[in-house]
Amino acid sequence: MAALGCARLRWALLGPRVAGCGLCPQGARAKAAIPTALPADEAAQAPGAGPGDRRRRRSLEELPRLGQLRFFYQAFVQGYLLHLHKLQVLNKARYGPMWVSYLGPQLFVNLASAPLVETVMRQEGKYPVRNDMQLWKEHRDHQDLAYGVFTTDGHDWYQLRQALNQRLLKPAEAALYTDALNEVIDSFVVRLDQLRAESASGDQVPDMADLLYHFALEAICYILFEKRIGCLEASIPKDTENFIRSVGLMFQNSVYVTFLPKWTRPLLPFWKRYLDGWDTIFSFGKNLIDQKLQEVVAQLQSAGSDGVQVSGYLHSLLTSGQLSPREALGSLPELLLAGVDTTSNTLTWALYHLSKNPEIQAALRKEVVGVVAAGQVPQHKDFAHMPLLKAVLKETLRLYPVIPANSRIIVDKEIEVGGFLFPKNTQFVFCHYVTSRDPSTFSEPDTFWPYRWLRKGQPETSKTQHPFGSVPFGYGVRACLGRRIAELEMQLLLARLIQRYELMLAPETGEVQSVARIVLVPNKKVGLRFLPTQR
């Protein structure tokens, strides 16, 4: 009854959006309104029009359409609001690999196959525009804060990106953070062993997602702000605990404020909680930036400009003159959030699947201990000799892309995609979740099989994988800014854990599914057992 009541409440909130429309979601009228699905091979493989090509290019109006009312019915009544990634699967089966959907007055063209995604990504231009960060922009405008690298577009974005790129994107620069990350991993192992000792079995951690979230937050703060904030202490500082809580608050409520009409904001608690979460995040970031500014000023006063030693990322940004403190405050919290979710969720899913697949886990351990001598700590140079470890992370990101969908607007030209001609300023949605589980691209797409990414002696070699079948870090000039750091962080921690422990699922964990809290997260606690290995 409670579930039915919630469904009725959600439906009632749509108010004037459904009033007088005669909506009958499961009746004949709804069925008759569904367009014919676009054939997958026709949409995904239609070649682009070359010079002199006289074949007819179809228009936007000929695409199958998901009506706004039907979408709201799916999200709020059928319960897909926290399962929008699975809604991609449903809609692709119904409409084909390309369909139109609406949110308010905004039209979206959804792309759900690797060739279609590639076509758009390769034509993004110098200043790719994304229009899926509007909620973040509303908060920045509300508090008169500078936009960051995720919320800025055009030439301003390009300049900001260039300033932030210097110490993050180049592999050689990212490798410089190895010692800092290993320091945080040392603390993580201590905390993990404390939790194991506290468990009834003496070897169990009840909630790996939570522990890895604290690890990822500690690591990215140490890199960006050059300060340990105590996330892995047995007793976490109050300010840090409030910050951690506020990040969850912001993400959880952003799901609701994205789809609920604006007139509900004064009536329901979601909008205020969303703003409060962001306010705490920025307050925390501002305190860390202010502390670093005070350190820089103190160095200048004591040693002059020639005596200032650039120690890390934030120090470099503030002393280079490329970013003002206001601009740094706009971007660093955004980088922080991106870094936390990428590593914590991916590592949670990786450990979960390794626990379920002991043969793969044993092969990975053999690889790691064959490269890293007993008693030694993995270093960045070691991963050139660990193809299976890289494949485990790549396969995890294929199954669980951190962001299951994102969007781009092609602003400077019309574009042909799959035989359809789209005007300038068309907004495309990349449906990463369903694309990376496409059976035409990946054999047994729902199976965790890291060997598909290795070249020799694996069944997948009989099929050519499409390079855009899984693009978890994006592509081109707007690819993930922190990719190199995230990869290094995940490689270092996964290698250390496999080196030290045999992983097993806790008995109460069972089967874990994903839910979309903007990012893909487990729907329940992932409890694991860590049994020390004999070396």
Curated annotation (Swiss-Prot):
EC id: 1.14.15.15
One Pfam family cited in the UniProt record for this chain: p450
Protein location: Mitochondrion inner membrane
Residues given in the record as heme binding sites: C480
Tagged with keyword Transmembrane helix: no
GO molecular function terms attached to this record: cholestanetetraol 26-dehydrogenase activity; cholesterol 26-hydroxylase activity; cholesterol 7-alpha-monooxygenase activity; cholesterol monooxygenase (side-chain-cleaving) activity; heme binding; Hsp70 protein binding; iron ion binding; vitamin D3 25-hydroxylase activity
Transit peptide per record: 1-36
Entry membrane topology: Peripheral membrane protein
Catalyzed reactions: 5beta-cholestane-3alpha,7alpha,12alpha-triol + 6 reduced [adrenodoxin] + 3 O2 + 5 H(+) = (25R)-3alpha,7alpha,12alpha-trihydroxy-5beta-cholestan-26-oate + 6 oxidized [adrenodoxin] + 4 H2O; cholestanol + 2 reduced [adrenodoxin] + O2 + 2 H(+) = (25R)-26-hydroxycholestanol + 2 oxidized [adrenodoxin] + H2O; (25R)-3beta-hydroxycholest-5-en-7-one-26-al + 2 reduced [adrenodoxin] + O2 + H(+) = (25R)-3beta-hydroxycholest-5-en-7-one-26-oate + 2 oxidized [adrenodoxin] + H2O; (25R)-3beta,26-dihydroxycholest-5-en-7-one + 2 reduced [adrenodoxin] + O2 + 2 H(+) = (25R)-3beta-hydroxycholest-5-en-7-one-26-al + 2 oxidized [adrenodoxin] + 2 H2O
Cofactor (UniProt): heme
Biological process (GO), any one: cortisol metabolic process
Pathway(s) this gene product operates in, as recorded in its UniProt entry: Hormone biosynthesis; cholecalciferol biosynthesis; Steroid metabolism; cholesterol degradation; Lipid metabolism; bile acid biosynthesis
Region of interest (Sterol-binding), residue spans: 387-401
Residues with N6-acetyllysine modification: K286, K524
Tissues in which the UniProt entry reports expression: Expressed in all tissues tested. Highest expression in liver and duodenum, followed by adrenal gland and lung. Low expression in kidney and spleen.
GO cellular component: mitochondrial inner membrane
Protein family (similarity comment): Belongs to the cytochrome P450 family.
Entry function: Cytochrome P450 monooxygenase that catalyzes regio- and stereospecific hydroxylation of cholesterol and its derivatives. Hydroxylates (with R stereochemistry) the terminal methyl group of cholesterol side-chain in a three step reaction to yield at first a C26 alcohol, then a C26 aldehyde and finally a C26 acid. Regulates cholesterol homeostasis by catalyzing the conversion of excess cholesterol to bile acids via both the 'neutral' (classic) and the 'acid' (alternative) pathways.
Assembly notes: Interacts with HSP70; this interaction is required for initial targeting to mitochondria.
Descriptive protein name: Sterol 26-hydroxylase, mitochondrial
Organism field: Oryctolagus cuniculus (Rabbit)
Underlying gene: CYP27A1
